[in-house]
UniProtKB/Swiss-Prot annotation:
SUBUNIT field: The nucleosome is a histone octamer containing two molecules each of H2A, H2B, H3 and H4 assembled in one H3-H4 heterotetramer and two H2A-H2B heterodimers. The octamer wraps approximately 147 bp of DNA.
Compartments, record wording: Nucleus; Chromosome
Domain of life of the source: Eukaryota
InterPro entries xrefs: Histone-fold, Histone_H2A, Histone_H2A/H2B/H3, Histone_H2A_C, Histone_H2A_CS
Species assigned in the record: Chlamydomonas reinhardtii (Chlamydomonas smithii)
Main location class: nucleus
Protein name: Histone H2A
SUPFAM superfamilies found in the cross-reference section: Histone-fold
MF-aspect GO terms: DNA binding; protein heterodimerization activity; structural constituent of chromatin
Pfam families listed in its UniProt record: Histone, Histone_H2A_C
UniProt function note: Core component of nucleosome. Nucleosomes wrap and compact DNA into chromatin, limiting DNA accessibility to the cellular machineries which require DNA as a template. Histones thereby play a central role in transcription regulation, DNA repair, DNA replication and chromosomal stability. DNA accessibility is regulated via a complex set of post-translational modifications of histones, also called histone code, and nucleosome remodeling.
Cellular component terms per the entry's GO annotation: nucleosome; nucleus
Length: 129
């Protein structure tokens, strides 16, 4: 009857749900928050994995665009201004986060077309009268 019981059978190392799903975001922590938040009486096993994947994708998308904005401004560090520019210049992210205020984000540079100086017709040397 050797080998029976509840003792450790092998030295397998525990693998997190994040690692199983190939994610960087913590699936276990998100599951805990979903349970603690009382969003529903019960939470399915796949729900925190899916939510972690969605959050990771959105974060990667925003960071990619913010990194591009920082590089365009010849900076090595992403600051809130770069995140603001990234979100507001992207159509889909702008729609998703339209009502969100980003602290120290500033505003998009925009001059209404009516306020711009009028363009004159022709080029140089028109006034030869």
């Amino acid at each position: 009857m050797a080998g029976r019981g509840k003792g450790k059978t092998s030295g397998k190392k525990a693998v997190s749900r994040s690692a199983k799903a190939g994610l960087q975001f913590p699936v276990g922590r998100i599951a805990r928050y979903l349970k603690k938040g009382k969003y529903a009486e019960r939470i399915g096993a796949g729900a925190p994995v899916y939510l972690a994947a969605v959050l990771e994708y959105l974060t990667a998308e925003v960071l990619e665009l913010a990194g591009n904005a920082a590089r365009d401004n010849k900076k090595n560090r992403i600051v809130p201004r770069h995140i603001q520019l990234a979100i507001r210049n992207d159509e889909e992210l702008g729609k998703l986060l339209g009502e969100v205020t980003i602290a120290s984000g500033g505003v998009l540079p925009n001059i209404h077309a009516v306020l711009l100086p009028k363009k004159t017709k022709g080029g140089k040397g028109e006034e030869t009268a």
